[in-house]
């Protein structure tokens, strides 16, 4: 069995991976996301970011042959504009105000790299999420919890912001940060059966 390495500091990704895999390592990627400019295609962009994270970690462990590195990146898009992590409370408020009453997309790019062979596969998942109409007071109260500050799109579906979600079309785990079904099929493609 290959050693699985998750190239992520995200606690949410680690928790999700623990649901399907008992034994894996975490090595945080030091990949500079700004080194890949966003051109136009969000799905290609998130796959490139995921690959960059996986390759960054693989360079740290090149002397260890039996490793598969999982890279992942998740972005929120609204009107073909990327909503990253908010810079401050005002930014978080504005993001949530824009999402209020509207549908947006959550994209996750996945990359799995076999360190020994340098074989890499990439893929992405897109989930559509519709928010209810939110009041300014609801948004302000949520922003003041601090919860939105480390999350793309300024919300976490698995937390207090779950009540904002009117409906979801696609993979719930993608919105949390790690699309488990897609990851499982990619791991199988790389010879890992969970």
Swiss-Prot record:
It comes from the Bacteria. Its EC number is 3.6.1.9. It catalyses: dTTP + H2O = dTMP + diphosphate + H(+); UTP + H2O = UMP + diphosphate + H(+). The active site is at residue 73. GO terms for molecular function: dTTP diphosphatase activity; UTP diphosphatase activity. Its cofactor is a divalent metal cation. Its main location: cytoplasm. InterPro entries: ITPase-like_fam, Maf-like. The record marks 12, 74, 158 as: Important for substrate specificity. GO terms for cellular component: cytoplasm. GO terms for biological process: nucleotide metabolic process. The keyword Membrane does not apply. The keyword Hydrolase applies. CDD domains: Maf (cd00555). Keywords: Cytoplasm, Hydrolase, Nucleotide metabolism. It is found in: Cytoplasm. Nucleoside triphosphate pyrophosphatase that hydrolyzes dTTP and UTP. May have a dual role in cell division arrest and in preventing the incorporation of modified nucleotides into cellular nucleic acids. Belongs to the Maf family. YhdE subfamily. This is dTTP/UTP pyrophosphatase.
